[in-house]
C-alpha cells in the first residue's frame, strides 16, 4: 500500500475521485431550488442565499484549510483535512434534508461549503506538488472531476426528487458522497522530499516555481489582478450554474423533449457538466504549451460568447 500511495498518478486519481464526490454540492444545486420552493413555500431568492453562503465558505476558507494541511505535514495533512471535509459534506446535505427553516438550510450550506473547500484545496494543492513539471495538466485533471462529476448524477438526482422528494435526494446523496470522500481520504498524502523526480518533458513554455510568503503575495499587484479576474469569471459562471433550471423554466424549454425522452434541462445539465470537466484538463494542457496568459484570454473569451448566447438565443432548446 505504501508503494501504491507513493505513486503520483495514483494520488492524482484519488484526488480526482474525491472531487467527483463533491461536484453535486455546486453543480447539482439547481435541481433542488424549485422543489424546495414549492414544498416549503420559500422565496427563490431566500433559497439561493444558501448557495451564496456555500460558495463564500467553499472559497474563502481554502487558504486556512491549505495552511492546516501544510501544518499537519505531507502524510497527515491531506488525510485529516479531506476526512473532515467528507464528514462536513455529509452533515451539510443531511441537515438540508431535515431543514424546515431557512436558518437550518443556511447552516447546512455553511457546513457543505467548508467541507467542499477542504477537499478542493487539498486535492488541487496536492496535484501541484506531485506534478511540478505538469502543473496545468494535473490541476486541470483534478478540477475536471469537480466540473464533470455532477454529470453522472443529474439523472439519478432528478429521479429521486421526482419519486421521493428533494429531502430523500439530499439525505442519500449527501451520505454517500461524504462517506466515499471520508474513506478515500486515508489513502491521500503529499510528496516527501525525493518522491518527485525532475521530468525530462520538453515544454515550449518556461515554468517557474517560486516560494512567496503570504504577506508578499497580498501586496503584489499581479495577485490582486488575478484575484479580480477570477472573481468576475467565476461569478458569471456560478450565476448561470445556480439558476440554469429556473432559466430553462422561464424560457419554457425546461421539459421540452430533445431526444430519447431526455428533457432540455437534463441534457443541458449533463452536457454542461461534461464540457466543464473536459475543458479543464484541455486548457491545463494548452497552458503548459502556450502559457497561462494566452490560455486565459481564450477561455475567458469563449465564456463571454456563451453567456451572450444564453441571453439572446436561450429560448431555443438546442441553443
Predicted feature locations:
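Hydrophobic core of transmembrane alpha-helices in multi-pass small-molecule transporters
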Residues: 20, 92-93, 103-118, 231, ...
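Residue-level signature of mid-helix packing/kink "hotspots" within the transmembrane helices
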Residues: 27, 55-63, 150-151, 273-281
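Extracytoplasmic gate region of multi-pass secondary transporters
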Residues: 27-36, 215-285
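Intracellular juxtamembrane helix-capping segments at the cytosolic ends
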Residues: 36, 118-131, 138-139
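Helix-to-loop junctions at the C-terminal end of transmembrane segments
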Residues: 61-76, 279-291
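C-terminal ends and interior cores of transmembrane alpha-helices
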Residues: 87-100, 301-315
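Helix-loop-helix hairpin linking two adjacent transmembrane segments in secondary transporters
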Residues: 142, 146-193
Amino acid at each position: 500500500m505504501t508503494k501504491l500511495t507513493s505513486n503520483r498518478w495514483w494520488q492524482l486519481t484519488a484526488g480526482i475521485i474525491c472531487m467527483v464526490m463533491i461536484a453535486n454540492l455546486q453543480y447539482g444545486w439547481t435541481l433542488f431550488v424549485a422543489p424546495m420552493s414549492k414544498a416549503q413555500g420559500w422565496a427563490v431568492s431566500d433559497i439561493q442565499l444558501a448557495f451564496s453562503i456555500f460558495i463564500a465558505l467553499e472559497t474563502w476558507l481554502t487558504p486556512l484549510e491549505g495552511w492546516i494541511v501544510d501544518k499537519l505535514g505531507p502524510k497527515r495533512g491531506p488525510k485529516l483535512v479531506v476526512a473532515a471535509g467528507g464528514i462536513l459534506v455529509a452533515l451539510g446535505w443531511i441537515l438540508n434534508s431535515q431543514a424546515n427553516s431557512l436558518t437550518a438550510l443556511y447552516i447546512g450550506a455553511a457546513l457543505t461549503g467548508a467541507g467542499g473547500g477542504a477537499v478542493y484545496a487539498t486535492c488541487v494543492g496536492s496535484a501541484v506538488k506531485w506534478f511540478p513539471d505538469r502543473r496545468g495538466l494535473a490541476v486541470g485533471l483534478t478540477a475536471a472531476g469537480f466540473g464533470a462529476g455532477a454529470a453522472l448524477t443529474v439523472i439519478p438526482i432528478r429521479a429521486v426528487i421526482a419519486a421521493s422528494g428533494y429531502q430523500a435526494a439530499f439525505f442519500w446523496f449527501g451520505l454517500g458522497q461524504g462517506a466515499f470522500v471520508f474513506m478515500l481520504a486515508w489513502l491521500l498524502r503529499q510528496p516527501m522530499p525525493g518522491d518527485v523526480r525532475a521530468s525530462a518533458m520538453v515544454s515550449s513554455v518556461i515554468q517557474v516555481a517560486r516560494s512567496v510568503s503570504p504577506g508578499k503575495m497580498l501586496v503584489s499587484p499581479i495577485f490582486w489582478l488575478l484575484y479580480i479576474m477570477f472573481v468576475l469569471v467565476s461569478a458569471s459562471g456560478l450565476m448561470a450554474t445556480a439558476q440554469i433550471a429556473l432559466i430553462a423554466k422561464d424560457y419554457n424549454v425546461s421539459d421540452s423533449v430533445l431526444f430519447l425522452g431526455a428533457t432540455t434541462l437534463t441534457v443541458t445539465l449533463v452536457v454542461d457538466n461534461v464540457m466543464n470537466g473536459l475543458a479543464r484538463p484541455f486548457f491545463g494542457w494548452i497552458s503548459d504549451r502556450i502559457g497561462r496568459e494566452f490560455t486565459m484570454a481564450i477561455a475567458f473569451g469563449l465564456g463571454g460568447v456563451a453567456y451572450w448566447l444564453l441571453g439572446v438565443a436561450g429560448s431555443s432548446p438546442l441553443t
